[in-house]
C-alpha cells in the first residue's frame, strides 16, 4: 500500500469531515516573504545556517551552556543544579544568554554548537576536544551518563526512563508549537486548530495523570531525568504558567500531576535552575547569565 493510499488528500479530507475549505488557498509553491514583520520574524526562517559572524563566549568552567529560560532551556539548568546539589563539582557551568528574539541563535558561533539553531546548546570542554551536544533531551541524557546520576542502570528501569524522556520530546511540540501558538500567539484565534491541539494537550495531561496515580515520580520511587525533562513543560502548564491557559484546560482536575508538580517545585535545584537565563517576569527571579553558584544567592 502506498502513502497516497494510506492518507486522504486535503480535498478528500474535507469530503470525509463534511467541512468547507478554509479561506486560505495555498499557492502551488510556497515562497518566503522576507519583508514580513511580526513577533516571530527573527525566530523562524525556512533555511538553516548563520546570518552573521559572532563567536560564542567561553567562561572558566568546562561546561558551557548557551540558552534561554524557556521550558527546553530550563531542563538543562535544572539538571546541572541538581548535579551540583549532589556535590558534583565537575557539573559547574557557565550559562550564556541566547536572545532568540534578536536572532542570536543564527550567529556563526551558535550554529557551530547547534546546526539546528535552537536553544539550548552545551559545549563540554573537559573532553579531549570540545564536545557539542544539542537538543535538550540529548543534553540531559549526556549529563546523566557523564556523571552517573538520575538515569537508572538497570536495563528495564533505564528503558522506562528513556521512554518517558522521548515521550516528552515527541509530545511538547503539540503543546508549544501547536496549542500554545494557536491559543496565545497566532494573529487570529481560530476554533479548529485550538480545539484540535487542546484535545491533544488534555490527552497528554491524562497520560501523565494516570501514570502518576501510583508513582511518586514519573518512573516510580526515584527522581530521574524523566522528571527533569517533563516538569518544565507540564509542571509549568499545571501551575497555569504557560499561555495563561490554566482555567481553559482545567489543569486543577489533574490531581496527580498537581501533586507531582508541587513536590518538584519544592526542590531547591529546580527553583535555582528556573532562574538561569531568565530575562522576563519578576525581577527577583531573573538571572540573564550564570557563572558561579553565588550568582543565584543574591
Where do the protein language model's features map onto the residues?
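GST-like fold's C-terminal all-alpha helical module
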Residues: 2-13, 19, 163-266
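Short, flexible helix/strand-to-coil boundary loops that buttress conserved ligand/catalytic motifs
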Residues: 154, 176, 241, 274-277
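Residue-level recognition of oxygen-bearing side chains
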Residues: 138, 256, 269
Amino acid at each position: 500500500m502506498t502513502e497516497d493510499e494510506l492518507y486522504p488528500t486535503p480535498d478528500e479530507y474535507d469530503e470525509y469531515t463534511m467541512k468547507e475549505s478554509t479561506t486560505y488557498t495555498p499557492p502551488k509553491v510556497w515562497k518566503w516573504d522576507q519583508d514580513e514583520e511580526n513577533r516571530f520574524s527573527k525566530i523562524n526562517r525556512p533555511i538553516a545556517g548563520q546570518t552573521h559572524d559572532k563567536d560564542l563566549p567561553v567562561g572558566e568552567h568546562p561546561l558551557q551552556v548557551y540558552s534561554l529560560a524557556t521550558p527546553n532551556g530550563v531542563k538543562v539548568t535544572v539538571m546541572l543544579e541538581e548535579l551540583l546539589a549532589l556535590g558534583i563539582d565537575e557539573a559547574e557551568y557557565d550559562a550564556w544568554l541566547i536572545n532568540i528574539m534578536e536572532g542570536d541563535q543564527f550567529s556563526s558561533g551558535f550554529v557551530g554548537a547547534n546546526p539546528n539553531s535552537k536553544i539550548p546548546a552545551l559545549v563540554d570542554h573537559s573532553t579531549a576536544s570540545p564536545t557539542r551536544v544539542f537538543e535538550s533531551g540529548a543534553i540531559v541524557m549526556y549529563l546523566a551518563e557523564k556523571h552517573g546520576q538520575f538515569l537508572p542502570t538497570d536495563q528495564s528501569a533505564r528503558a522506562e526512563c528513556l521512554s518517558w524522556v522521548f515521550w516528552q520530546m515527541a509530545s511538547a511540540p503539540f503543546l508549544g508549537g501547536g496549542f500554545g501558538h494557536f491559543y496565545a500567539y497566532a494573529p487570529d484565534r481560530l476554533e479548529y486548530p485550538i480545539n484540535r491541539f487542546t484535545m491533544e494537550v488534555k490527552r497528554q495531561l491524562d497520560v501523565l495523570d494516570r501514570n502518576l496515580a501510583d508513582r511518586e515520580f514519573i518512573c516510580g520511587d526515584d527522581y530521574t531525568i524523566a522528571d527533569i525533562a517533563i516538569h518544565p513543560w507540564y509542571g509549568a502548564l499545571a501551575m497555569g504558567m504557560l499561555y495563561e491557559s490554566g482555567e481553559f484546560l482545567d489543569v486543577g482536575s489533574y490531581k496527580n500531576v498537581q501533586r507531582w508538580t508541587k513536590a518538584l517545585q519544592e526542590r531547591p535545584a529546580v527553583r535555582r535552575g528556573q532562574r538561569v537565563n531568565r530575562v522576563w517576569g519578576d525581577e527577583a527571579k531573573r538571572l540573564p547569565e550564570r557563572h558561579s553558584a553565588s550568582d543565584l544567592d543574591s
